[in-house]
Curated annotation (Swiss-Prot):
Component of the ankyrin-1 complex, a multiprotein complex involved in the stability and shape of the erythrocyte membrane. Attaches integral membrane proteins to cytoskeletal elements; binds to the erythrocyte membrane protein band 4.2, to Na-K ATPase, to the lymphocyte membrane protein GP85, and to the cytoskeletal proteins fodrin, tubulin, vimentin and desmin. Erythrocyte ankyrins also link spectrin (beta chain) to the cytoplasmic domain of the erythrocytes anion exchange protein; they retain most or all of these binding functions. The gene is Ank1. Component of the ankyrin-1 complex in the erythrocyte, composed of ANK1, RHCE, RHAG, SLC4A1, EPB42, GYPA, GYPB and AQP1. Interacts with a number of integral membrane proteins and cytoskeletal proteins. Interacts (via N-terminus) with SPTB/spectrin (beta chain). Also interacts with TTN/titin. Isoform Mu17 interacts with OBSCN isoform 3/obscurin. Interacts with HIF1AN. Interacts (via ANK 1-5 repeats) with RHCE; this interaction mediates the primary membrane attachment site for ANK1. Interacts (via ANK 1-2 repeats) with AQP1 (via the N-terminal). Interacts (via ANK 1-13 repeats) with EPB42. This is Ankyrin-1. SMART domains: ANK, DEATH, ZU5. The modification (3S)-3-hydroxyaspartate is found at residue 691. Residues 824-834, 1489-1500, 1637-1647, 1681-1694 have a biased composition (Basic and acidic residues). The lineage of its organism: Eukaryota, Metazoa, Chordata, Craniata, Vertebrata. Gene3D superfamilies: 2.60.220.30, 2.60.40.2660, Ankyrin repeat-containing domain, Death Domain, Fas. Transmembrane segments: none annotated. Residues 886-900, 1648-1666, 1695-1720 have a biased composition (Polar residues).
């Protein structure tokens, strides 16, 4: 019986251990003691806890098993669960009240055990539930000590960080460095010898030690190899930190260990900057003594002396000056240290600087002097100091602001008083003629204004646009200021140039109190703007109801007629301000008031579909039948616009649907014209006549047939419209449809009974018309049904028949003060752009008009108007209004934006039209300004005139251009070529040349054959124009007008093949004969060439060219080293004269002012330079002073020469440098100036990041840029700006946008005329809470501190909202991780394919991932817009097809030059380097999936430089950007450091930088040598007769390794993912594809199963890799390439490659197998590293056996790795060490793996395998192709060696494999 009980107890324990709950409960029901235990004291709870059976544990606890029962070793269930890492069990036990700090016999706590085994989750849970990590073992060791000893860094970091103040999350070594804990640091370094481990913020422990001035740990780190110059991504080195902290000993230590003294942060700060900014004089001195660069500049141009001045560090300033720092050194913004001191108010520093000679009047880039800044910042002591030391009180900024302007705007009354007392003028004006009073009024500073008025400031002072201070005050609504100004004599009725009074301004802004104050002072309501708007009009326009109410209460006239007779009610209706309409109507606003064209407010409401407004107007008596001048009613307009609801409303209010206008057009006619069927339905239902005729007899069916509206034709026919109705010309609807070529309508009309044989009044049938006009389809339809006998012969000319239409317009101007700018600068017939849209809706569709010589003149093919939607229009006008109404501000000078407008649609030819003896003219549809005028009686016969553009590269011989000449226009090809006209014709060509400095002229070149070019001459001048026009009604602008529009007029009697405009320097020419003569320059009158008799033997044309040399250009380039005379050239050059000719050239300015000597030849500083190079070659200057005699007279030098050439005088004291200086200067002088515009496109990729595309273009081809097709939005367009050919253009961003700099990417590009000069700038938003906008400036030079910058263009940009679709960025994200996905493309794979297949495979990947970027790539590969559009048209449905077509086209074009490197470069340039990395980088990364970033790979994030130009005065007065920076500190939450992106650090615990860690109460080490290790409890049960059938083996591989995946004991899943960048299954690519496609042969399956007994296990382990290959092989293009090479890849070894089949691999690889136990699982990880020429190739295969083994040994034998069954062991360390980025060499490092298993005696055996390359073999010349193997074993056979602390043996094996190469 006792035996049965023992069996039952054992069976119960076995059930508890295996988790068989039912069996265990049965035993308990049968009376088994729940607390029974085995021979080691383990009860059911212990066993279930160890195995992790949560349900069993919970049930046992419910059954009241004793929770705190201990084993013989003193372990509770919590100890055992913690040791085994069973976190769920740990939670249950703790929740049931288990003692978290219970100690076993030797003092081990559960926390100690979990820390020892690296169970991080258990450690975290125990700590959170009261575990005390300071409870030590009997030996005095804490959990931290054992975790340190075991090298569990994550656990160490958590233990150290837990419970500390703040949220410190630094890695363990950093904590040790912070606490100067050398002992802990030493142990940590023993476990991981890398001392340069990075924190989350990118700092090393040495950085931390430097910050906390911990010298001991710093020395330890340096001794252990810490990099003293380690540079994280932000560029901050330990020396920077030590210099900032001020620890002299630390700085000396770092310098002694080789710290680089010139190292710079990402913002270019040196250690000297840091020391100077914090006032550390001693450190500054040490650094200077070690050679620190005293003039080093930060990114913003700050030098150390600026830093010291900013920090008010007097001693530092003195020290730097003592070491010869430049006292007036300047930043990028040209701020000197004195500016900085003035900005910060540091009086003492300013005094020292001034005493040492600083210039008190130095000007910043925007013209601010230190005095301006002191006045702005209200530093009165600094201001007084500056004035005492000579600062100019009248100094002005770039925009003309004096210190008094600045102080007045900022409202600093004491400063204002002081300045006025010191003699500043109260009425001084800036460039916009604004006084300080304007400034004070605009900013609302009443006290300042009052004081200025007391000091004789003029209350009515007028600015440039006649704005007074009262306008400024009224605009901001500052009633107090308004009253003050009115009390001091300000006139309330003074108007600006646009006619606005202060009351208009207040009305616009809606400032009621301000308006009331003005009205009380008798402000006139009758004053009108230039467009006739009263204040009430303005209030009505902007919807200011309260203000309109106030004006009406003060007797405003509600029906005052303004411009074009518009009343306030018209304006309110036009702007849809319903509240204003409802206010005006009861107050007497008349709904009947007509505008000049008879439109009532109801007409406007009807046209704009404003239902509520229309109801209000009708309610107050508005007539639904009111007629305009042309008889148009509101119903006409609503019907034409297609507003069904409005039509129904008007008809319900007695509108007459049959009422025609003056031409008889009814609403139904207009509906038929536009095709609005629903409106036609409403009209018919209300009884409208379906066959109403116009004056010319057109019915609605005629109109619908003419305009091709087939649905309406059907509708009218359904409602019994007369299908054969005739017009007065006898045209039926069938005639109209035939004339317009509408085949479908012709067919429909015939089906509905239209007679095809009807003839018009001149006897024409529809068939005859169709034939005459060439409509083949219509002819075919009509031919069948028309009676041929009725087709009468007609004359050649067909008279077109057009229905009438409405052609009146109403200008309800969107802008009461200024003209809106359209595509033309001039206005057209006083029409407003918005209303031209309305006009276009009424006029016939010109693109449907058939050309015919019978019509004398046809208007433009494409009317050159700009259509702006009403809301856009209002916005545009508002911006324009801002400029006219704002008191002038620097923004209006510096911002170069103009309103973006849509470009017109382009047709094929620029011009193409027929002309006969009556003449005609045509404007270009694409180029504004292009026009061809053929006067009457010029053509002998009907002629088609064409005009098109020609690319220079298409010409046989482009126009020959000297270096100072350039093409000013596109090359124009006119047709017919060689046409001769009876009298002159006129061609006007737009050009883009700038007159530069006034020294250039335009020349027309012509070519008859494309090879020879000559100057075009015409004997007809401008005076002949009227005679040439021959009575033609064509307006020709004057030469002045053409010059403004940049149009060149050519008068010619024939058409050559080509015309082109050339820009060159002005020349004065004449014909010189044997009698001699002279030429004098008109540009520089002192320049003269004299030709004596017989210098030439026959009459020849000679020219004299004089090019002035501006002094400022010489100064800018050369300083005061030399001065120059004008350059004088006799053309043609290189001509020899029979007698010497005389030349006179003015002397250089410096020589004229102060002749240095009267010497001659080489002794004089005056040098004569000459270049005899002719033609188009570059000038080569030489000094001919020694061989030419100069005679001085009247400030000129005279000399003679036998050869025509270029001559130049230079006054250069360094005579040897004269030629060099001249060459430099000449290069700048010869650059051709052009007028170009900057256009900016933008797109946001997400909320913070976006892209800008900047264009600098001459002719307007914006709509052809690729950005139009890629969801970019135009955000800015500049006015025309002068740029020079070849000029580098540098872009600078400021404001809330920051450029993101990529490696080797510059934000600059060069201007080339007639090219799309393009620059891509990736940007990110600095502050997402503010508007994503800023300023983009273009400069001639990069922002260096020494350059005085001239800003070419300053654009205000706002990024468009992010429109995320299935865009490129989304698509790119789905590709990650690319290196893992495309391991198929690594070198190891490609090595087995042919070169062709390799290229094709790569091309396939490129085209698959190019997506929308293909168009960018096309641009980068220099494909034209036409090519890109053709690709787009030919492949409309697929991006893949478009990418494929592009790459094919590129390969065809490049031929042999199509190199992958070129393609990679292009991909990088368009920001698609991830594709290149995917293709190129996988081979390099084969040793490590996630390599450490190289320390040198810093991605600098550029901070914006301040530019000259501000959006408003407030911006101009803001602190300069260069002063807005924070100081370096690695641990404080400083903005300076926080912008750094975190680089991939070693995967430690999450880290943050914060406060100091207190570790004084935390015991780490005790006196013991090393911490004791806990051994696991023996859970084996004694043998019994009862079968062990209760055990339920759980072979879950994932579960087996889940506990190892957290620490250094990486699970297999991690391993496989880490090694699959370049790895594959044993058989490589082909076998992998075979597995994926189910095509592997049976033989292969058998081979594999020989070594893999459970293939499912392998698949689950390598699942990441399997999925990768599944995805890539699903890709059709890659699959296609791979399939072609599959035959080869399946049999690599036959071709002498290095791969082996599985059986060979098994034989050649090392393996240890234990075949004990009933079940065997193998996990196989194979690494193939690609063949590199001449290098050793490694092939490694690891077989890991997983077994079940029930240990039967003595009770005391326990597994050291407690908690893991022997069957569930895993490798203790990763299979391969990660290699640091900087350590990646050709020779792989050692790789160490450890494996543990239990031998037959129950001992724990540890096998350690060291794999390393023994040597490298140069296989390039190897003949022997046999495989070699070297195996070295270390250790005494396989006899176990005991390892201290563990029972077991260590087997060390080194294996390497080398192979020859065929």
């Amino acid at each position: 019986m006792g035996f049965c009980k023992a069996d039952a107890a054992t069976s119960f324990l076995r059930a508890a251990r295996s988790g068989n709950l039912d069996k265990a409960l049965d035993h308990l029901r049968n009376g088994v003691d729940i607390n029974t235990c085995n021979q080691n004291g383990l009860n059911g709870l212990h066993l279930a806890s160890k195995e992790g059976h949560v349900k069993m544990v919970v049930e046992l606890l419910h059954k009241e098993i004793i929770l705190e029962t201990t084993t013989k070793k003193g372990n509770t269930a919590l100890h055992i669960a913690a040791l085994a890492g069973q976190d769920e069990v740990v939670r249950e036990l703790v929740n049931y009240g288990a003692n978290v700090n219970a100690q076993s016999q030797k003092g081990f706590t559960p926390l100690y055990m979990a820390a020892q085994e690296n169970h991080l989750e258990v450690v975290k849970f125990l700590l959170e539930n009261g575990a005390n990590q300071n409870v030590a073992t009997e030996d005095g060791f804490t959990p931290l000590a054992v975790a340190l000893q075991q090298g569990h860094e994550n656990v160490v970091a958590h233990l150290i960080n837990y419970g500390t103040k703040g949220k410190v999350r630094l890695p363990a070594l950093h904590i040790a460095a912070r606490n100067d804990d050398t002992r802990t640091a030493a142990v940590l370094l023993q476990n991981d010898p890398n001392p340069d481990v990075l924190s989350k913020t990118g700092f090393t422990p040495l950085h931390i030690a430097a910050h906390y001035e911990n010298l001991n740990v710093a020395q330890l780190l340096l001794n252990r190899g810490a990099s003293v110059n380690f540079t994280p991504q932000n560029g901050i080195t330990p020396l920077h930190i030590a210099s900032r902290r001020g620890n002299v000993i630390m700085v000396r230590l770092l310098l002694d260990r080789g710290a680089q003294i010139e190292t710079r942060t990402k913002d270019e700060l040196t250690p000297l900057h840091c020391a100077a900014r914090n006032g550390h004089v001693r450190i500054s001195e040490i650094l200077l003594d070690h050679g620190a660069p005293i003039q080093a500049k930060t990114k913003n141009g700050l030098s150390p002396i600026h830093m010291a001045a900013q920090g008010d560090h007097l001693d530092c300033v003195r020290l730097l000056l003592q070491y010869n720092a430049e006292i007036d050194d300047i930043t990028l913004d040209h701020l000197t240290p004195l500016h900085v001191a003035a900005h910060c108010g540091h009086h003492r520093v300013a005094k020292v600087l001034l005493d040492k000679g600083a210039k008190p009047n130095s000007r910043a880039l925007n013209g601010f002097t230190p005095l301006h800044i002191a006045c702005k910042k209200n530093h009165i002591r600094v201001m007084e100091l500056l004035l005492k030391t000579g600062a100019s009180i009248d100094a002005v900024t770039e925009s003309g602001l004096t210190p008094l302007h600045v102080a007045s705007f900022m409202g600093h009354l004491p400063i204002v008083k002081n300045l006025l007392q010191r003699g500043a003028s109260p009425n001084v004006s800036n460039v916009k003629v604004e006084t300080p009073l304007h400034m004070a009024a605009r900013a609302g500073h009443t006290e300042v204004a009052k004081y200025l008025l007391q000091n004789k400031a003029k209350a009515n002072a007028k600015a440039k646009d006649d704005q007074t201070p009262l306008h400024c005050a009224a605009r901001i609504g500052h009633t107090g200021m308004v009253k003050l100004l009115l009390e001091n004599g300000a006139s309330p009725n003074l108007a600006t140039t646009a006619g606005h009074t202060p009351l208009h301004t207040a009305a616009r802004e809606g400032h009621v109190d301000t308006a009331l104050a003005l009205l009380e002072k008798e402000a006139s309501q009758a004053c009108m703007t230039k467009k006739g708007f009263t204040p009430l009009h303005v209030a009505a326009k902007y919807g200011k109801v309260r203000l309109a109410e106030l004006l009406l209460e003060h007797d405003a006239h509600p029906n005052a007629a303004g411009k074009n007779g518009l009343t306030p009610l018209h304006v309110a209706v036009h702007h849809n301000n319903l509240d204003i309409v409802k206010l005006l109507l009861p107050r007497g606003g008349s709904p009947h008031s007509p505008a000049w064209n008879g439109y009532t407010p109801l007409h406007i409401a009807a046209k704009q579909n404003q239902i509520e407004v229309a109801r209000s107007l009708l309610q107050y008596g508005g007539s639904a039948n009111a007629e305009s001048v042309q008889g148009v009613t509101p119903l006409h307009l609503a019907a034409q616009e297609g507003h069904t609801e409005m039509v129904a409303l008007l008809l319900s209010k007695q509108a007459n649907g049959n009422l025609g206008n003056k031409s008889g057009l009814t609403p139904l006619h207009l509906v038929s014209q536009e095709g609005h069927v629903p409106v036609a339905d409403v009209l018919i239902k209300h009884g409208v006549t379906v066959d109403a005729t116009t004056r010319m007899g057109y019915t609605p069916l005629h109109v619908a047939s003419h305009y091709g509206n087939i649905k309406l034709v059907k509708f009218l026919l359904q409602h019994q419209a007369d299908v054969n109705a005739k017009t007065k010309l006898g045209y039926s609807p069938l005639h109209q449809a035939a004339q317009q070529g509408h085949t479908d309508i012709v067919t429909l009309l015939l089906k509905n009974g239209a007679s095809p044989n009807e003839v018009s009044s001149n006897g024409t049938t529809p068939l005859a018309i169709a034939k005459r006009l060439g409509y083949i389809s219509v002819t075919d339809v009509l031919k069948v049904v028309t009676d041929e006998t009725s087709v009468v012969l007609v004359s050649d000319k067909h008279r077109m028949s057009y229905p009438e239409t409405v052609d009146e317009i109403l200008d309800v101007s969107e802008d009461e003060g200024d003209e809106l700018v359209g595509s033309k600068a001039e206005r057209r017939d006083s029409r407003d752009v918005g209303e031209e849209k309305e006009l276009l809706d009424f006029v016939p569709k010109l693109d449907q008009v058939v050309e015919s010589p019978a019509i004398p003149r046809i208007p433009c093919v494409t009317p050159e108007t700009v259509v702006i939607r009403s809301e856009d229009q209002e916005q545009a006008s508002k911006e324009y209004d801002e400029d006219s109404l704002i008191p002038s501000s620097p923004a209006t000078e510096t911002s170069d934006n103009i309103s973006p407008v849509a470009s017109p649609v382009h047709t094929g030819f620029l011009v193409s039209f027929m002309v006969d003896a009556r003449g005609g003219s045509m404007r270009g549809s694409r180029h504004n300004g292009l026009r061809v005028v053929i006067p009457p009686r010029t053509c002998a016969a009907p002629t088609r005139i064409t005009c098109r553009l020609v690319k220079p590269q298409k010409l046989n011989t482009p126009p020959p251009l000297a270096e100072e000449e350039g093409l000013a226009s596109r090359i124009i090809a006119l047709g017919p070529t060689g046409a001769q006209f009876l009298s002159p014709v006129i061609v006007e060509i737009p050009h883009f040349a700038s007159h530069g400095r006034g020294d250039r002229e335009l020349v027309v070149l012509r070519s008859e054959n494309g090879s020879v070019w000559k100057e075009h001459k015409s004997r007809y001048g401008e005076s002949y124009l009227d005679q040439i026009l021959n009575g033609m009604d064509e307006e020709l602008g004057s030469l002045e007008e053409l010059e403004k529009k940049r149009v060149c007029r050519i008068i010619t009697t024939d058409f050559p093949l080509y015309f082109v405009i050339m820009s060159r320097l002005c020349q004065d020419y004449d014909t010189i004969g044997p009698e001699g003569g002279s030429l004098r320059s008109k540009l520089v009158p002192l320049v003269q060439a004299t030709f004596p008799e017989n210098a030439v033997t026959k009459k020849v044309k000679l020219a004299l060219q004089a090019q002035p040399v501006p002094d400022e250009l010489v100064t800018k380039l050369l300083g005061n080293q030399a001065t120059f005379s004008p350059i004088v050239t006799v053309e043609p050059r290189r001509r020899k004269f029979h007698r010497p000719i005389g030349l006179r050239i003015p002397l250089p300015p410096s020589w004229t002012d102060n002749p240095r000597d009267s010497g001659e030849g080489d002794t004089t500083s005056l040098r004569l330079l000459c270049s005899v190079i002719g033609g188009t070659d570059q000038a080569q200057w030489e000094d001919i002073t020694g061989t030419t005699k100069l005679i001085y007279a009247n400030e000129c030098a005279n000399f003679t020469t036998n050869v025509s050439a270029r001559f130049w005088l230079s006054d250069c004291p360094r005579t040897a440098e004269a030629v060099h200086f001249a060459t430099l200067l000449y290069k700048e002088l010869t650059a051709v100036p052009y007028m170009a515009k900057f256009v900016i496109f933008a797109k946001m990729n997400d909320a913070r990041e976006g892209r800008l595309r900047c264009y600098c273009m001459t002719d307007d081809k914006v709509d052809k840029t690729l950005e139009q097709h890629e969801n970019f939005v135009e955000v800015a367009r500049s006015r025309d700006i002068e740029v020079l050919e070849g000029m580098p253009l540098f872009a600078e961003l400021s404001g809330n946008l920051v450029p993101v700099k990529k490696a080797a990417q510059q934000r600059s590009f060069h201007f080339q005329s007639f090219r799309e000069n393009r620059l891509a700038i990736p940007v990110k938003v600095r502050d997402s809470s503010r508007e994503p906008g800023g300023f983009l400036s273009f400069l001639r030079k990069t922002m260096k501190y020494e350059d005085t910058q001239h800003i070419l263009c300053h654009l205000n940009i706002t990024m468009p909202p992010c429109t995320k679709g299935s865009g490129a960025e989304d698509r790119r994200r789905t590709l990650t991780p690319l290196t893992l996905r495309y391991s198929i493309l690594s070198e190891s794979r490609l090595g087995f394919t042919s070169d062709t297949d390799r290229v094709e495979m790569r091309m396939a990947v490129i085209r698959e991932h190019l997506g929308l970027s293909w168009a960018e790539l096309a641009r980068e590969l220099q494909f034209s817009v036409e090519d890109i559009n053709r690709i787009r048209v030919e492949n409309p449905n697929s991006l893949l097809d478009q990418s494929t077509a592009l790459l094919t086209l590129w390969v065809d074009r490049e031929g042999e030059n199509a190199k992958m490197e070129n393609l990679y470069t292009a991909l990088r340039n368009i920001d698609r380097s991830e594709i290149v990395n995917m293709l190129e980088g996988s081979g390099r990364q084969s040793r490590n999936l996630k390599p450490e970033r190289r320390h040198g790979d810093r991605e600098y994030s550029l901070s914006p430089s301040q530019v000259n130009g501000y959006s408003s005065l407030q911006d101009e007065l803001l602190s300069p950007a260069s002063l807005q920076y924070a100081l370096p500190s690695p641990l404080c939450a400083d903005q300076y450091w926080n912008e750094v992106t975190v680089i991939d650090a070693i995967p430690l615990a999450a880290t943050e930088h914060d406060t100091m860690l207190e570790m004084s109460d935390m015991q780490v080490w005790s006196a013991g040598l090393t911490p004791s290790l806990v051994t696991a409890e023996d859970s084996s049960l004694e043998c019994s007769k009862a079968e062990d059938s209760d055990a339920i083996p759980e072979w879950k591989l994932e579960g087996a390794h889940s506990e190892d995946t957290q620490g250094p004991e990486l699970g297999s899943q991690d391993l496989v993912e880490d090694d699959t960048v370049d790895s594959d299954a044993t058989n490589g690519l082909a076998d992998l594809l075979g597995q994926e496609e189910g095509q592997r042969s049976e033989k292969k399956r058998q081979e594999v199963s020989g070594t893999e007994q459970d293939t499912e296990t392998e698949v689950s382990l390598v699942s990441g890799q399997q999925r990768v290959h599944a995805r890539i092989t699903d890709s059709p293009s890659v699959r296609q390439v791979l399939d072609r090479s599959q035959a080869r890849t399946l049999d690599w070894d036959k071709q002498g490659s290095t791969a082996v089949h599985p059986q060979e691999a098994t034989q050649s690889s090392w393996q240890e197998e234990v075949t004990q136990g009933p079940h065997s699982f193998q996990r196989r990880i194979t690494t193939i590293q690609g063949p590199e020429p001449g290098a050793l190739q490694e092939y490694e295969q690891v077989l890991v056996s997983t077994r079940e083994h029930v240990q039967r040994g003595p009770p005391e034998t326990g597994s050291p790795k407690a908690g893991k069954e022997p069957s569930l062991w895993a490798p203790e360390s990763a299979f391969s060490q990660e290699v640091q980025g900087d350590e990646l060499q050709n020779i792989p490092g050692e790789q160490v793996t450890e494996e543990q298993f239990t031998d037959e005696q129950g001992n724990i055996v540890t096998k350690k395998i060291i794999r390393k390359v023994v040597r490298q073999v140069d296989s390039s010349g190897a003949i022997d192709t046999q495989q070699h193997e070297e195996v070295e074993l270390r250790g005494s056979g396989l006899q176990p060696d005991l390892i201290e602390g563990r029972k077991g043996a260590q087997i060390v094996k080194r294996a390497s494999l080398k192979r020859g190469k065929q």
